[in-house]
């Protein structure tokens, strides 16, 4: 892996109130109060930077070994330094702010790799927590001991990054902190590089992470100068692909290009023009937008992430009559749905097209709405209750669909998403009994283009709904999440937003019928 040619951090001295203990390795400790500068061979103020280095190849640094990660960071960012902080993994979080303010590199631990890195950096002074046994790491260097719990550490050497330094960005995952994060932050600040936070290690998570990715992109070639800390970022190839998506692909309502976990959704369910199928059709499109936004707002106080309003539009409606095509499903014209899709896009509302196909297969019906599914804010739901075999009839039997048909439809939608450079699509499977998806274990649910959910459609008493939920959440295929439906009339009583979000696991998608 190509590295950044290290830089020199020129050091000056800074007077600060407080206490520091100056210890020359091999000598007794001496506590000095009101010290102007610790005596010893440290470089004085007025130092100048060496030539600026080139940016390193972008890399993902493992965050599990804090010591190894700190060595990798300093070796990438610094050529030499007059002073360095050496901390234990336990003390590092307390010292990170001080290290950043002082502009000092930070190393974690005192093992052989750290000793070797200290020899390369050639500092005259080591700053460490009081009582730290530096062992061979101290060498003949001056040691300044500080109390990590103190409000200030007294007079410490300070560094400054060269003005002509290479553009480097350090990426941190705030939702999955690693032991290496404190030193990563300290070393980035000491080197004058930016720290960008990307939840879940994914620049596509939300609007803030996309903005951070664009800030990194402004530096130039994404193949250089990006150091990501932690396993959540995946491989460097995965991170590079995600960065490319974050900076080039349209965003979902609420920001970002992956549906979850950067948001949750609350949807009005139904079909335009009729109140018989759900609340969505009880008003016109503008009224539905207003109502859905009000529903989502009721969930916001109970959510750990933003709640986005959504429509779940029954686009093909199960019918008791065979109809002209004999499939017991009435397909709404795409242009009728388009009015709602257009209005939803303008209002920041996500749309899921729900299929009740009768005797037609799901893929055939989905392809009828291909142009709508090419829109960035439109996903798909397969309602297996209404998927009939040739001799079955609605309301006489509960329909079902096998994994092969689900996978065929999902493959097509994933390809459509990929070929049209679209953000991830929500892909919903309705279910209230195991018979509806009889071989669910064979469904491939981890396609990166799709966020696949099982939508628990059970209604009735609290015990009945939770019984359905607890059954359906068992043995989910890898990559499949959970969704929930609240019924105004059939539930006794209707669950409140707080009660709904107290369910385990908390549903990503909630619809109202």
Predicted regions: what they are:
Residues 39-42:
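Bacterial signal peptide processing site
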